[in-house]
Amino acid sequence: MFKNLLCIIIFLGINLNVYAINSSSYTTDDIIKIVIILGIVILIFSPAKFRIIVIGTMLGLSCAYFTYKYIVPIFISLLNGP
């Protein structure tokens, strides 16, 4: 498991260097894709008890993200008024 995760971390480091050479940076969409891929890899190589914790954490973080991205701006716009 750790060998596979180490390969993925090295791959992400190479990608980060390529982004730095091209003088661009990760966007939010890139980071979300990386987190999803890492979550899937961790789920594949993790034991059953740990898998339940990871699934719960991923669900909680995704709910928090969508709340922050979609619901909070609605309340902010309501506070600002028409």
UniProtKB/Swiss-Prot annotation:
The chain crosses the membrane at residues 5-22, 26-45, 52-74. InterPro entries: DUF5510. Keywords: Cell membrane, Membrane, Transmembrane, Transmembrane helix. It is found in: Cell membrane. One of its GO terms (cellular component) is plasma membrane. Pfam families: DUF5510. Its main location: membrane. It is a multi-pass membrane protein. It comes from the Bacteria. This is Uncharacterized protein RC0131. The lineage of its organism: Bacteria, Pseudomonadati, Pseudomonadota, Alphaproteobacteria, Rickettsiales.
